[in-house]
A protein has these predicted regions:
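N-terminal secretory signal peptides that target proteins for export/translocation
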Residues: 1-16
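Second-shell loop/turn segments in exported
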Residues: 69
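Non-catalytic, beta-strand-enriched accessory regions in extracellular/secretory proteins
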Residues: 73-75
Length: 180
């Protein structure tokens, strides 16, 4: 009788363990699948490029329109060459963009450049010699200063502003994806 009870208990434990392991694996698969779907970019069927993506304005005068055509009203005229914008959608030769203040509209694709620029979104941030909080500062950058993005690694991005190069905290700038 004692051996039978132990076998029954052992059999129940094995059955429970198998079920628990299957449920655990299914949940792990669902969580990983959801995480990869949320972080993945959509690939545009028009250009083959990811959406959303960052680009910059080619010229000093670029119209932001309500829709993807010259027939639509101009809502805003940008007058800042290299201003970074994020392409969120595409329609023919038009790109729906959002700027760092959240304004959205349509810009003709030839007025955009694939060159990557950033804009300072904090009131002030320090341009540093090296990537690190203990590094010496080279300059204080004010809000809306535009710089050329060279690369990002971890918390820091290496940028160029006129003839200065240095590191700035990624969270203080706009024009980079969260994944960088």
């Amino acid at each position: 009788m004692y051996i039978t009870i132990n076998r029954d208990i052992l059999s129940n434990i094995k059955t429970f363990s198998k079920r628990f392991l299957v449920i655990l694996l299914i949940n792990l698969f669902l969580i990983l699948n959801a995480m990869s779907a949320s972080s993945a970019s959509i690939i545009s069927d028009k250009t083959g490029l990811p959406l959303p993506r960052f680009v910059s304005l080619k010229g000093n005068k670029v119209n932001l329109r309500r829709g993807p055509s010259l027939d639509y009203k101009i809502d805003w005229v940008y007058q800042r060459k290299h201003l970074p914008v994020m392409i969120v959608s595409e329609f023919g030769h038009w790109r729906k963009v959002t700027d760092f203040e959240g304004y959205t509209g349509w810009i003709y694709k030839d007025l955009l450049s694939g060159s990557r620029y950033i804009i300072v979104k904090k009131e002030e941030t320090l341009l540093r010699n090296k990537a690190g909080f203990d590094s010496l500062g080279k300059a204080i950058l004010k809000r809306e200063v535009i710089g050329k993005l060279i690369n990002c690694e971890g918390l820091w991005c290496f940028i160029r502003i006129k003839n200065m190069r240095g590191y700035v905290l990624a969270e203080h700038i706009w024009g980079i994806s969260e994944a960088k």
